[in-house]
């Protein structure tokens, strides 16, 4: 795992691994701030586990303070696709997977290239997906299609974050970026229900600072945004299943209708102005 992390840093932030004084000082500071040692330990530890064991261990260790509502909305058998917002990154997938495991122990989730690079050995629970079209290749797409065909033929539930990237911090809270139409296309092809899911949680101040100041630091800091969630509250709410036939036949409109259902699950409250803004925006489409 240490070699993978060093290679990732060299690729994403090459100036950090230079041998000049400033780079060395900053790198040593970031190693402590971003818990590199713990990342390496956890990565090495789970390599000897099965996919389910690994992600349940990560969930118990790092998303242990998670509450969930609506597990009864998950079908007891057959394929379905849980469609969620993406506020934190890896922590969203780990928290949702480990909670879903209580009622479905055969789930899988869509994982981006960073997640696959670090934890790519767990092929039985991950479907690799490249959200950045510039990085997409024919071979990568072929692997994804083959993996999905296997998972859905086995009647397994999936977890997807259609934004493909982490939510953006704004003055009105966390906003998901534009959603891909993938859930709608998959539901039409495979004829399974879509399950709206809202995840509430947030990343560290350093991550949001880096997001607005330095893309390279942001990429490096993502390594820490699972391991700093221990004892921090994460809330998950699962809505009722949605048939794709209940949505618009226009895929662009259908994905916005589905997003509205996810945003409707946001917690209500006096200061939840972001919920009001979201629903006002997407209500015009539904």
Protein language model regions, located:
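Membrane-anchoring hydrophobic helices of lipid-metabolizing enzymes
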Residues: 1-80, 93-95, 104, 272-286
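Catalytic core of membrane glycerolipid acyltransferases/transacylases, capturing the structured
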Residues: 36, 80-137
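Residue-level signal for well-ordered alpha-helical scaffold segments within enzymatic catalytic domains
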Residues: 57, 95-102, 150, 185, ...
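Short, flexible loop segments at the rims of nucleotide/cofactor-binding pockets, characterized by
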Residues: 57-63, 134-139, 172-173
């Amino acid at each position: 795992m240490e070699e993978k992390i060093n290679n990732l840093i060299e690729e994403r932030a090459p100036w950090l691994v230079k041998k000049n004084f400033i780079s060395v000082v900053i790198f040593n500071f970031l190693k402590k701030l971003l818990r590199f040692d713990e990342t390496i330990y956890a990565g090495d530890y789970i390599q000897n586990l099965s996919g389910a064991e690994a992600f349940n261990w990560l969930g118990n260790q790092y998303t242990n303070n998670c509450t969930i509502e609506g597990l009864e909305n998950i079908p007891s058998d057959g394929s379905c696709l849980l469609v969620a917002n993406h506020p934190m990154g890896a922590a969203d997938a780990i928290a949702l997977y480990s909670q879903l495991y209580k009622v479905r122990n055969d789930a899988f989730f869509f994982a981006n290239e960073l997640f696959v690079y670090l934890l790519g050995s767990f092929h039985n629970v991950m479907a690799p997906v490249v959200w950045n079209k510039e990085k997409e290749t024919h071979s990568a797409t072929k692997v994804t299609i083959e993996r999905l065909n296997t998972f859905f033929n086995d009647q397994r539930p999936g977890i997807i974050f259609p934004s493909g990237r982490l939510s953006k911090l704004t003055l009105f809270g966390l906003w998901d970026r534009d959603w891909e139409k993938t859930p709608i296309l998959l539901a039409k092809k495979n004829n399974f229900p879509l399950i709206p899911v809202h995840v509430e949680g947030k990343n560290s101040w350093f991550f949001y600072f880096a997001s607005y100041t330095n893309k390279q630091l942001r990429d490096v800091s993502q390594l820490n945004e699972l391991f700093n969630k221990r004892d921090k509250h994460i809330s998950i709410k699962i809505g009722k299943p949605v048939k794709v036939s209940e949505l618009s036949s226009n895929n662009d409109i259908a994905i916005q209708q589905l997003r509205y259902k996810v945003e409707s699950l946001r917690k209500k409250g006096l200061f939840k102005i972001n919920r009001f803004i979201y629903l006002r925006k997407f209500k015009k489409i539904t």
